[in-house]
Amino acid sequence: MAKQRDPVIDSMRGIGIVLMVLGHSGFPGTDFIYLFHMALFFMLSGWLFSLRGGPVHFIKRKAVTLWLPFVLANTAFTVLNNLFLKLNILTSDERILQVPGNAVTTPVTVKDVIGRTVHWCVFDGGTQLGGAMWFIQALFQVSILYALVEFILQRLLHGADTLLPQGLFSGVLLWVGWRCGLAGWNVWGLGIAASCYCLFYLGTVLRRTTRESIPTYQRGIFAAAAFAVLLILGRLGSVGLAGNGYSSPIFLLAASLAGWVLVREAACLTAPLPCVR
């Protein structure tokens, strides 16, 4: 029997994807969107987290769905590097450096392709065209670490609730990730992973604590309140998870939770509509 899909979660994913596209297209509200849109995906992943089947099965599944696509995509971009140079998709012209977010690209050899693929396998670096895959890398690292910690805690606590120790661990990692961001340290993307672990954890907490039966008018009030909070936060600081940058750990948590409330209430209000089903 096919697994029953949650229309609200599907709607939240859809809203998140739309926000991501808008945020990367010069949309006037980009700074507002960046406050929470990537945190939303980590939290959704935490919401859907399950160790059913055991940690080995979980790790194998994540290797196929996250690690392998990361390696294959970056390897493909490297193999096609010289073709992209000829087509002017990439360039060796140093004037490109005047445009933020770009880099000078040089031709590669077969040796370069092999060597760089080895680096992709351990998340060491990336390609210019594959820059957006930082999320895939971070989600893989966070998911695997969370699963291992969960498995160890279940063994140590003999089946007792792991929510509190996981929360303490995520708090420590959030502080470490924030300090890494301030220091500019992000080897193998571990600084970003440390910061985002708490977002994954929040998703697991929200799944256990969220009330489903809420009157429609209350959902509208919650969404409006969350929107107002995000407007205020947007004047106080910013979030850029791709570079492990955020004003403070508390700021990241507040913006992420407000964004979750806004998107979830919007999804709950729109999921029953015929055009969304």
Which residue ranges define each predicted feature?
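Loop-centered beta-sheet repeat module
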Residues: Q166-T210
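Hydrophobic alpha-helical transmembrane segments
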Residues: P7-V18, A132-I136, G191-L202, L262-A271
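Hydrophobic alpha-helical membrane-embedded or membrane-associated segments
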Residues: T65-P69, A73, V142, S170, ...
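Interfacial loop-to-helix transition and helix-capping segments at the boundaries
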Residues: F27-M38, F123-A138, C180-L199, G234-V261
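Membrane-cytosol interface segments of multi-pass membrane proteins
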Residues: M1-L174, G184-W185
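Transmembrane alpha-helical segments
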Residues: S45-G53, Q141-I152, C198-R211, A255-T270
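Hydrophobic alpha-helical segments of polytopic membrane proteins
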Residues: L156-L168, G203-V229
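Alpha-helical transmembrane segments and terminal signal-anchor/GPI-anchor hydrophobic tails
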Residues: S213-R277
